[in-house]
């Protein structure tokens, strides 16, 4: 999927500002978030310019206290992007020091919250009435 940018929210309270969400999708999200999931939804017209030509947006409410506290303190969701590489899982995608070494000239800040998990999040496409697991990861439905 081309949609490699996601929005990290503190909770689901302002979800309709970023995505169009059906009742069934909202219930599924409410049951499993915060957690290791990315839900792909149709975009709302209120999204930032970076999403202007996109029809879908990934929504995340991770079960990570550092991330959620950062979002809550900012008062707004943040955009996130997964580290992509040809390798499946490599050490520098989970080690904060190695992430900093590799990306220090491409990112403004790396927050050291310890080593990350090696298992990716579960991605669920909720753009139609028939939800589809795009990638099975750590999250179980």
Question: Where are the regions a protein language model picked out?
Answer:
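Active-site-adjacent structural elements in enzyme catalytic cores
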Residues: 1-141
């Amino acid at each position: 999927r081309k949609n490699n940018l996601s929005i990290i929210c503190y909770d689901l309270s302002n979800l309709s500002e970023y995505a169009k969400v059906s009742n069934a999708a909202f219930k599924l999200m409410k049951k499993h978030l915060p957690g290791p999931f990315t839900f792909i939804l149709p975009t709302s017209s209120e999204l930032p310019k970076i999403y202007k030509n996109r029809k879908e947006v990934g929504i995340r409410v991770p079960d990570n206290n550092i991330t959620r506290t950062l979002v809550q303190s900012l008062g707004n969701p943040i955009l996130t992007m997964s580290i992509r590489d040809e390798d499946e899982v490599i050490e520098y995608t989970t080690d904060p020091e190695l992430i900093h070494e590799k990306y220090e000239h491409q990112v403004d800040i790396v927050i050291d919250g310890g080593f990350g998990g090696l298992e990716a999040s579960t991605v669920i496409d909720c753009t139609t009435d028939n939800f589809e697991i795009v990638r099975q990861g750590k999250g179980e439905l």
